[in-house]
Amino acid sequence: MTEVVHLHMPEEARATQSRDATPRERRYYVWTVGCQMNVSDSERLEAALQGVGYAPAERPEDASFIVLNSCSVRASAEERILGKLSEVQRLKRKHPDTKVVLWGCMVGPGNQSIFQSRLPMVDHFVSPSAVDEVLALAPNPIYQLEEPALPVARWDHPPVSVHVPIQYGCNMSCSFCVIPLRRGRERSRPLDEIVEECRRIVARGAKEITLLGQIVDSWGHDLPGRPDLADLLRAVHDIPGLLRLRFLTSHPAWMTDRLIAAVAELPRCMPDINLPVQAGDDALLKIMRRGYTVQRYRDLIAKIRDAIPDVSLTTDVIVGHPGETRERFEGTKRLLEDIRFDKVHIAAFSSRPGTRAADMELDPTLAVPEGEKQLRRIELERLQEQIAAERNARFLHQTVEVLVEGEHKGKWRGRTPGNKLVFFSDPDDWTGRLARVIITHTGPWSLQGVLARSDETFARVNGALHAVAAANGAAV
């Protein structure tokens, strides 16, 4: 999953903070590094903190309660957290009463004793996703929560799209991944609990829900009756007011015919599937302990595209894993050329302590030099940029439906059913609404267009585009 730094503070909170008289002792600051699961955990914590009377602080020095939600997927993520902790250490010299919590995947089994000696500025260490445990550490609460906090609970303007965790942990044993060591074994949330939470979120104004799990398509196998993700999609799909439904991240081993059929049949379930492949060589997939072959993956992609012709497919790839020869890397390159994904998250291998791949990295006959890792990463990124540009070009002059998430640099920003990012201009407020947009420009990362307010507008703009194309000797 992509490593991102997130500062969790709603825009309206920033705008009104200077007018807010909340004292420092009831202000919090949450800083998050990592995947969307971490982001969701932090959003829930913020909603809970606001529910007991806290207000967000824009800067750590303005808060008495600081929470750093950490990631261990790559070394760079841990380095960011350690850098932030150095900043916090200086702050605590000035404000020794500040309470600091290190939360998330850095705080796994066996790690707390190590970090307690290395990180004296941290008052408490809390395992991933334990929102209630972090909340209990907050000093000076005014209220008590009457029900579990939602990620939109205290926001005047809830986000258009909300991520809902449906499962925690992971039972896989991929050679490179530290997540099972940090988040533990899979635990699925009950179907009724998830549906009720989604219902409450939509009632607060959210329009799109993304169901979230480390291996989201394995949801339910540990629950009574063994429901599956297809069952859950059908249950959430029928919530009144919900416009769109997505899920991530999937594993090829759990992508069943029932799940593919559900995505194909449910109109509000978006044709958007993330299916990490990690490598395009059978020997390397075996080393990685992925549990499938290249041909099985290719067959699965063909099955998905046959059932969902307009599907948008994204994947994850690791380059430089121990044992990746140049020949094996070329297999991954061929796979990307053949399948032509809409988007690929490409990462250079990062050795994580405790994983099988970390031991392999110590073998000089298996390790890939760091410089070579980066060269391979750049090579695939350039290839994928070209593929993405070509795939997005098919939207030129087409009218697409865009769920508008908000404003960005003077333009409205939203996404198509296939999760393509679209920008357009209009004086009206389109936040949370579905817009018909005629695409006038495409690129590898986003699309731009004009609003088609009516059939007359569509005909006028489309006619102009045809005229331009004809003048250039091209077909629309």
Curated annotation (Swiss-Prot):
Basic and acidic residues biased stretches: 1-14
Single GO cellular component term: cytosol
Annotated MTTase N-terminal domain residues: 26-147
Cystine bridges: none
Keywords: 4Fe-4S, Cytoplasm, Iron, Iron-sulfur, Metal-binding, S-adenosyl-L-methionine, Transferase, tRNA processing
Cofactor(s) essential for the protein: [4Fe-4S] cluster
Binding positions for [4Fe-4S] cluster 1 per the UniProt entry: 35, 71, 105
Segments forming domain Radical SAM core: 156-390
PANTHER family named among the record's database cross-references: CDK5 REGULATORY SUBUNIT-ASSOCIATED PROTEIN 1, MITOCHONDRIAL TRNA METHYLTHIOTRANSFERASE CDK5RAP1
Family named by the database record: Belongs to the methylthiotransferase family. MiaB subfamily.
Record's subunit section: Monomer.
Name used for this protein in its record: tRNA-2-methylthio-N(6)-dimethylallyladenosine synthase
